[in-house]
Amino acid sequence: LEQIGQHPEQGWKKTEGYDPIQKAFIESGSIQCGYCTPAMILAARALLRQNPNPSEAQVREALSGILCRCTAYVKPVQAVLKAAADIRNSGQTLSEDETYPKAYEPDMVAVHTLPETETIGKSEIKVDAAKLAQGKPAFTADLQLPGTLIAKVLRSPYAHAKIVRIDSSKAKALPGVAAVMTWEDLPRVVYSTAGQSDPIPGPLDMFSLDNKVRFVGDRVAFVAAETAEIAEKALSLIDVTYEPLPVIVDPRDAMKAGAARIHDEPEYVNFADSNPAINLAAKIRIDIGDVEKGFAEADRIFEQEYVVPKVQQAHIEPHVTLTYWDEDDRLVIRTSTQVPFHVRRQMAPVLGLPIKRIRVIKPRIGGGFGNKQEVLIE
């Protein structure tokens, strides 16, 4: 893996067409987000070199070390079994330096040349499946610009605390550090992280940095440095004094009179009957029809309190953002988001820029499942 580097496709020989494994992944619909596809193809290649006729269990074992969130491994396993059969039927074997003729390339015809009903009732190949099967650059982190700084975030060890004092002088003096930012260095602009349509669903309860932390892992300071190692070292040099505040972990306790307020900032903007005085994020009631009459006529009435825990979508690609100024003095935000236009609209007031001076580019994302509808690191 160290020899292959960031792009796993470098582990096989480049050809004009596609080898049988790539072809099987493309034609079987095995490629979803594509973030894990090159690694799966390399694992399949290693398996089929040793065992040209594997069982399904052997294929699953070969792919088991590769994390995949999208496919549940169903289609990739089918693709490897199909590739194995195709190779056996062709009389070929996999070798270290195999090349395959153009004939292995699946038929792809430009859409504008097709009759109107040509595709009805037929399976179509994913438009960027070939690119992903070849492991070509497709994701945010695949673009590496010269002179790029690495940003790291100092996070809170406390669930609820005030920042009484923060000293970043040692971090700023570290060679290779370009910038250190704390809440004292940034405009205090309230916003929502929810990437939804205007008007922005609230509550507006976030700041780029604040002098109060509200959960373990909340943002305390930013560092930009020449390398990730320097940035991490700089974070360790930031001296923070916290005043711990009462921690509330049960929503019932949070809504009791006299409970510590999580959001006591005056800039807080209400949404959906939220009530920061009792730590209520939202209150939503939906009535359909005559509710009172329905209860009065019901034979049975069931009342229950339902608790819905937060679920992590577990996409394989993390949140990644690359920003730079282009030749027209526009801020370009290249980011792994599902909502580029919402990012653009919400970033403008936070950065104090006209929206026309912000351009958001959304490359292929390595899974999101709704989690990348939130503006978190941009």
Language-model-derived ranges and their functions:
Residues 1-106:
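Signature of N-terminal electron-transfer/Fe-S-associated modules in redox systems
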Residues 2-5, 25, 29, 48-52, ...:
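Structural signal for hydrophobic packing residues in well-ordered secondary-structure cores
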Residues 40, 49, 153-184, 221-241, ...:
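Alpha-helical support elements that line or immediately flank enzyme active sites
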Residues 1-34, 230-256, 278-286, 293, ...:
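Gly/Pro-rich active-site capping loops and adjacent beta-alpha segments
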Residues 261-351:
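Helix-loop-helix junctions that connect adjacent transmembrane helices in secondary transporters/permeases
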